[in-house]
């Protein structure tokens, strides 16, 4: 039996910081999600991660991808994992404490 969490993970990868900031802003405004953080992948790529209920993460990632595309050719990928396996949790950045 897989050990999974009930919290979804949304990821948007961009070319550059400006599209990443635009995507993060749109995602957090569009739905009840928590911004987990951003990762500088290298070569100018930035990945923004959000967590929340699956429906909210879906809406947030859609809004973030749309916003990122309005900035230019910044969107590289957008992906959602509905139920993250507990072992994957260990490699994710920790959410900032409120």
Curated annotation (Swiss-Prot):
Residues 8-93 form the BMC domain. Disruption phenotype: Does not grow in ambient air, has a wild-type growth rate in 5% CO(2), called a high-CO(2) requiring phenotype, hcr. Fewer carboxysomes are present, RuBisCO is found to be soluble rather than in the carboxysome. Required for growth in ambient air. GO terms for cellular component: carboxysome. InterPro entries: Bact_microcomp_CS, BMC_dom, BMC_shell, CcmK-like_sf, CcmK/CsoS1_BMC. One of its GO terms (biological process) is carbon fixation. Transmembrane segments: none annotated. Its main location: other. GO terms for molecular function: structural constituent of carboxysome shell. Gene3D superfamilies: 3.30.70.1710. Expression of 10 genes for alpha-carboxysome (Cb) proteins (cbbL-cbbS-csoS2-csoS3-csoS4A-csoS4B-csoS1C-csoS1A-csoS1B-csoS1D) in E.coli generates compartments that resemble Cb, contain RuBisCO and have its catalytic activity, showing it is possible to make artificial, functional Cb using these 10 genes. Cargo proteins can be targeted to these organelles. Artificial Cb assembly in E.coli requires csoS2-csoS4A-csoS4B-csoS1C-csoS1A-csoS1B-csoS1D (but not the gene for carbonic anhydrase, csoS3). It is found in: Carboxysome. CDD domains: BMC_CsoS1 (cd07058). PROSITE patterns: BMC_1, BMC_2. Keywords: Bacterial microcompartment, Carbon dioxide fixation, Carboxysome. The tight homohexamer forms a pore with an opening of about 4 Angstroms in diameter which is positively charged. The major shell protein of the carboxysome, a polyhedral inclusion where RuBisCO (ribulose bisphosphate carboxylase, ccbL-ccbS) is sequestered. Assembles into hexamers which make sheets that form the facets of the polyhedral carboxysome. The shell probably limits the diffusion of CO(2) into and out of the carboxysome. Molecular modeling shows the central pore of this protein is selectively permeable to anions such as HCO(3) rather than CO(2) or O(2). There are estimated to be 2970 CsoS1A/CsoS1C proteins per carboxysome (the proteins differ by only 1 residue). Unlike beta-carboxysomes, alpha-carboxysomes (Cb) can form without cargo protein. CsoS2 is essential for Cb formation and is also capable of targeting foreign proteins to the Cb. The Cb shell assembles with the aid of CsoS2; CsoS1A, CsoS1B and CsoS1C form the majority of the shell while CsoS4A and CsoS4B form vertices. CsoS1D forms pseudohexamers that probably control metabolite flux into and out of the shell. This is Major carboxysome shell protein CsoS1A. It comes from Halothiobacillus neapolitanus (strain ATCC 23641 / c2) (Thiobacillus neapolitanus).
